[in-house]
Amino acid sequence: YMEDAAQKTRAQDELPQSAGGRTITTTEPKFIPQEAVELKLAGEVTIRVRLVDCVGFMVEGAAGHLEDGAERLVKTPWYDHEIPFTQAAELGTRKVITDHSTIGVVVTTDGSFSDLPQETYLDAENQAISELKKLHKPFLVLVNSSHPSSRTAREAAERIEKQHSVAAM
């Protein structure tokens, strides 16, 4: 928990927007909160935490990266010219993994909260896990679910644990 009420309010205000559906709402990596916050865990353990939200690897069927049937071009801080959205998303995600993280959190799904089936997330899930393993970054996998205690959610976590030999919950 956070003891400083003002810091907690500021951190909450800096959370990214989210919405249902297929449209990508993240456009670039965002540090949340902007400055690391102190959290008290069980006992006397205190940690400083800051998350990084990024698009991640593209999922088949997602919307927002195309405009009039063509890949959207976006400006990034890494190039002096526009590049395709998918390329920017992958580049930003890789930079977050390699340059800005000490512990990774891969967020995937059992397919329960959107109209995209679980299978459409598998390539992106595999790619993220492979990147983290290749760099020997510690990480865990979270299965986002509308029904976290359901058999489907448990089976998704078990599949990931078995397939990748990693912790998933």
List PLM regions with ranges:
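Solvent-exposed alpha-helices and their adjacent loops that cap or buttress functional pockets
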Residues: A42-V45, K95-D99, E161-K162
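Canonical P-loop GTPase G-domain recognition
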Residues: Q127-L140, S145-M169
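Conserved ATPase-coupling elements of RecA-like P-loop NTPase cores
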Residues: E60-G64, D115-E119, S150-R154
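Charged helix-capping and loop-helix junction motifs
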Residues: T120-N126
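Conserved G1/Walker A P-loop phosphate-binding module
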Residues: Y1-W78
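Conserved nucleotide-binding/hydrolysis micro-motifs of P-loop NTPases
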Residues: G56-M58, D110-F113, S146-S149
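Inter-motif core of Ras-like GTPase G domains
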Residues: A62-S114, E131-L132
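Loop/turn-to-beta-strand initiation segments
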Residues: T46-R50, T102-I103, P138
